[in-house]
Amino acid sequence: MNSLVALVLLGQIIGSTVSFQLGPNMDCNTKGTKDWADIGVHYINEHKLHGYKQALNVIKIFRLLPSDGRSVIFHFNLNLLETECHVLDSTPVENCTVRPQHNHAVEMDCNVRIIHDITTFEDEVFVKCSSTPGSVENILRDCPKCPILLSPNDPHVVDSVEYVLNKHNEKLSGHIYEVLEISRGQHKYEPEAYYLEFVIVEINCTAQEAHDDYHQCHPYTAGEDHIAFCRSTVFRSHASLEKPKDEKFESDCVILDVKEGHAHSHLIEHHVGKYSTSPGYNSTDECVVECPVAFVNKEVPTDISDHNTPPVKGCPGRVLHFQL
């Protein structure tokens, strides 16, 4: 499965408390370079509409571009890896586990341009990314029994998620949930099963109202205990053409602490009312936003006058996790 997703983001990060200092030559391994690259990674994670947060893996290319004398322009080509934290999870990406390679990891290559105004400390950030899962052949060669990634809208994945959700709703007296997003589906053998990851949201309906086509149910979009991230396994055959009825399953759901005003609260609005599957690796998202960035002490290179702007030496940088 070698399809691609294009994630196109355009925005402005404003940091009134950002400070900078003139520093020595920077390459793809210096702390100053990584500080600037982290601005791009932070921006991607704050505005990604689907799926999972991304962690920096390799700074592949770093260029200093021409400027008008008032700004410093950085261009990066970054290799990122998918973590196990959903974008609605408030856990800082630094504390998120990178998805292991044998669990069909996904990488993202991003072109990031940061235009830093040295008088106002404003950063304009331009990002374009493409995402690719690891090779099925390589995974099966190294781990024949490991689960293989499927499209989130695969019929077996969708049916299995709905089956688990119905089982949850049967047990939760007074609380009814619906699927907010199917973010991951995998198939494995020995024993044959479907591994699922999805987000659910509580709705303001009874069980009877939820099954009434004429009754409009509305999800709670903020507050305590209304949104949860679930990891489930449904043991069923890929050859089965019927929807699951009494299959054995395992499931664990964790409440997400998503509050009104949280950086991702607007993403809930994006999903609500649109039974959603993560777009996987073949869609485009755009946004124009402003958000504050925390205090960062960043180095600014002294030489930014080269109009041909070749990549700096010392690139690509170190691999922080692994290469797909």
UniProtKB/Swiss-Prot annotation:
Tissue: Expressed by the liver.
Annotated family: Belongs to the fetuin family.
Location(s) in or outside the cell: Secreted
Pfam families in UniProt: Cystatin
SMART domains membership: CY
Chain ranges of the Cystatin fetuin-A-type domain: 21-130, 141-254
Glycosylation-annotated residues: 95, 204, 282
Originating species: Protobothrops flavoviridis
Record-level GO cellular component terms: blood microparticle; extracellular matrix
This protein's name: HSF-like protein
Keyword set includes Repeat: yes
UniProt keyword list: Disulfide bond, Glycoprotein, Repeat, Secreted, Signal
Paired cysteines (S-S): 28-315, 85-96, 110-129, 143-146, 205-217, 230-253
GO molecular function: cysteine-type endopeptidase inhibitor activity
Summary of the function given for this chain in its UniProt record: May not have antihemorrhagic activity.
Complex formation: Homodimer.
Secretion signal span: 1-19
Keyword Transmembrane helix applies: no
Lineage top rank: taxon: Eukaryota
